[in-house]
């Protein structure tokens, strides 16, 4: 049990109920689920809630196109969403819908409190009207040129290019997204939330540590531009909640969508009477509330939402955590343009635990975009999960079952166990701070140590000798205990694997039991727990989504260059572009001392366009090397990897420092570079022969 139990409510942004979940969505739900599972693993009371965002004109119009009622459409989508999440092992404590009685009552409650407190203003405005469809046009159904940055083809509420928010009437050359007609102006009465009244409170809250620094800095730009009153009204016809005392007027979807967090929790409280809504949402609540969101909805969650809560007498969230976008092989994912892999398409071909681990290995607390590079995905999963983690058990468990009655020995030398347990606080801190990539590197470094221990001891040789049976029993028991610790550390990321390992050990994996003595404990016969990623399955998934995986000009200009599985810039005949060099004799080759090296640390070099500074462990000695691979790798992607270096190259003094060798890489250059990565059995310091 954790030292002091916390009460935590955690949410992910609500997926829109007009289409399927894709892998861009899944980043957020996997990120949040890992954090929620970690909190529960530490013994905290943590509730992970979500819901479908089920209102708005897009849903109304799509239902019309399908010839069904909006209620029927969102019910079907809700069912599909929940199935996708369940199959990805995302464990919500409650999944609801914003089109619910709980949410209607909460939205009305908050609106009426804001109105009674003087924060709702009414005024007549000129609204864009589609003369062909005889309907007012919601902001998402007007497209034109952004009035701020002049980017074309932007929606009527905010710009995807610069992030600015504005009124649809401010768009340059607006067009109806419904009919294509040029809209006309028509007067209508709307209600506005007085956001400027909360400027002082918001400036204090956004700098209180509730937001990432990058988010807080962005909000400062909006403060400088001046906060505007927020139109919370949409005219009929509209699928949503009617505003109290205002027939024909409806809440804008972005008013009742975040309230959906509260509505979903209300629904959970009704199912579990021991829960108190006010204990988590009351103004004086000491519970913790955290929102995980994408960087595209920062404005709504960091300005409108806390102001609405404050103005209606509820508490603000402790933190709002934003993440970046997902790209696939360097291409921007866009649902509107169809460049996405559906969650169900992935599940039809690949194990969801693969993606959970890959996302975790690349996630940090920053708001960086994350590239799902399918080649790297396959290599990393096969190397880390199959080659290192599961391999540790598969190569030792059989000896315990066949030769030692399935019972573990009392471990005499606990040096390795103590070293593994000593990392629990570091790994815990990384989970808590959402630095999952760093946690995965720590865990895989331990897996390397464990595999090195088994390789050096070679129990498969020991069991051939009568006088080494006890030693073999010790080695295999030690290895399996280390495996148990590793999988416990990974339980928030790999819940299905953890479940299989619990069945194998015939006991639960808990953080409190990390140091448990398993002497004499009986294990079950080992069964295969994870298969390698097969490229034919990856290719089949790509084929099913082939229209979504083309690298186009839509790739984000600010994203770091990524390596693609089949980069068009790489020649199909490398020998044509780079012929084999002149023949050398064996004595010349023998002078080159190639060694396995682990990249302990990688970092950018100030004022260097191409270089990364690497600290390399070559087995008892550390070398500093400057490598020209900055265009192809980010530092966090390199740390923990094994590679090959020229160890006897004369040190070279550079203006950035001394370079004590060279790492080997293949490719024509630029983003098309791949460092050499040896098989997982290789160890730092080994000579390459």
From Swiss-Prot:
Binding positions for Zn(2+) per the UniProt entry: 146, 149, 159, 162
Spans traversing the lipid bilayer: none
GO cellular component, one term: cytosol
Entry's Gene Ontology molecular function annotations: ATP binding; metal ion binding; methionine-tRNA ligase activity; tRNA binding
Sequence motif: 'KMSKS' region, positions: 332-336
Keyword Aminoacyl-tRNA synthetase appears in the UniProt entry: yes
Cofactor needs: Zn(2+)
HAMAP family linked to this entry: Met_tRNA_synth_type1 (MF_00098)
Protein name: Methionine--tRNA ligase
Species whose genome carries this gene: Shewanella baltica (strain OS223)
């Amino acid at each position: 049990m954790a030292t002091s139990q916390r009460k935590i409510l955690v949410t992910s942004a609500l997926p829109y109920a007009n289409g399927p979940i894709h892998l861009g969505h899944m980043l957020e739900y996997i990120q949040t689920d890992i954090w929620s599972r970690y909190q529960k693993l530490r013994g905290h009371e943590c509730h992970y809630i979500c819901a479908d965002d089920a209102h708005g004109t897009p849903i109304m119009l799509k239902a019309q196109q399908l010839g069904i009622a909006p209620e029927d459409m969102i019910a079907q989508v809700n069912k599909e969403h929940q199935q996708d999440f369940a199959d990805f092992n995302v464990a919500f404590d409650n999944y609801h819908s914003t089109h619910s009685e709980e949410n209607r009552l909460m939205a009305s409650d908050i609106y009426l409190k804001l109105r009674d407190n003087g924060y709702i203003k009414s005024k007549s405005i000129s609204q864009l009207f589609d003369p062909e469809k005889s309907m007012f046009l919601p902001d998402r159904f007007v497209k034109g040129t952004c009035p701020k940055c002049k980017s074309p083809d932007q929606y009527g509420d905010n710009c995807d290019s610069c992030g600015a928010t504005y009124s649809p009437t401010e768009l340059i050359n607006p067009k109806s997204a419904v009919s294509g007609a040029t809209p006309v102006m028509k007067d209508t009465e709307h209600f506005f939330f007085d956001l400027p009244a909360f400027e002082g409170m918001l400036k204090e809250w956004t700098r209180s540590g509730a937001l990432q620094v990058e988010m807080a800095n962005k909000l400062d730009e909006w403060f400088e531009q001046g906060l505007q009153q927020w139109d919370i009204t949409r005219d009929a016809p509209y699928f949503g909640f009617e505003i109290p005392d205002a027939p024909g007027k409806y809440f804008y979807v972005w008013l009742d969508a975040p309230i959906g967090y509260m509505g979903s929790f209300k629904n959970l409280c009704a199912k579990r009477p021991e829960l108190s809504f006010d204990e988590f949402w009351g103004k004086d609540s000491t519970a913790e509330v955290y929102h995980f969101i994408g960087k595209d909805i920062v404005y709504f969650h960091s300005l409108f939402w806390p102001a609405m809560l404050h103005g209606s007498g509820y508490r603000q969230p402790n933190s709002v955590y934003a993440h970046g976008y997902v790209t696939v092989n360097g291409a921007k994912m866009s649902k509107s343009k169809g460049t996405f892999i559906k969650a169900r398409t992935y599940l039809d071909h690949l194990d969801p635990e693969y993606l959970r681990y890959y996302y975790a290995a690349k996630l940090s607390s920053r708001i960086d975009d994350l590239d799902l590079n399918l080649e790297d995905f396959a290599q990393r999963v096969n190397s880390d999960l199959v080659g290192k983690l599961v391999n540790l058990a598969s190569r030792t468990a059989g000896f315990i079952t066949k030769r030692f009655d399935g019972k573990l020995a009392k471990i005499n030398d606990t040096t390795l166990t103590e070293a593994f347990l000593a990392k629990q606080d570091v790994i815990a801190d990384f989970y808590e701070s959402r630095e999952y990539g760093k946690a995965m590197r720590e865990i895989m470094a331990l897996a390397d140590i464990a595999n090195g221990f088994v390789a050096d001891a070679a129990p498969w040789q020991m069991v051939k000798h009568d006088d080494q049976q006890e030693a073999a029993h010790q080695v295999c028991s030690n290895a399996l205990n280390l495996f148990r610790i590793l999988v416990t550390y990974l339980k928030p990321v790999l819940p299905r694997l953890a479940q299989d390992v619990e069945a194998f050990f015939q006991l639960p994996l808990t953080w409190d039991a990390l140091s448990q003595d398993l002497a004499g404990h009986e294990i079950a016969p080992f069964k295969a727990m994870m298969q390698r990623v097969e490229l034919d399955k990856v290719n089949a998934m790509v084929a099913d989504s082939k229209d979504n995986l083309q690298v186009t000009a839509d790739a984000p200009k600010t994203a770091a260059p990524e390596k693609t599985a089949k980069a068009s810039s790489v020649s199909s005949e490398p020998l044509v572009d780079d012929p084999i060099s002149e023949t050398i004799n064996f004595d010349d080759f023998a002078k080159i001392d190639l060694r396995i090296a682990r990249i302990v640390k990688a970092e950018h070099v100030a004022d260097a366009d191409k270089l990364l500074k690497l600290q390399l462990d070559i087995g008892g000695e550390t070398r500093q090397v400057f490598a020209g691979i900055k265009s192809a790798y980010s530092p966090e992607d390199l740390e923990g990897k094994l590679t090959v270096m020229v160890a006897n190259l004369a040190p070279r003094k550079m203006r950035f420092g001394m370079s004590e060798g060279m790492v080997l890489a293949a490719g024509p250059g630029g983003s098309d570079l791949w460092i050499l990565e040896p098989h997982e059995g290789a160890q730092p310091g080994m000579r390459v022969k």
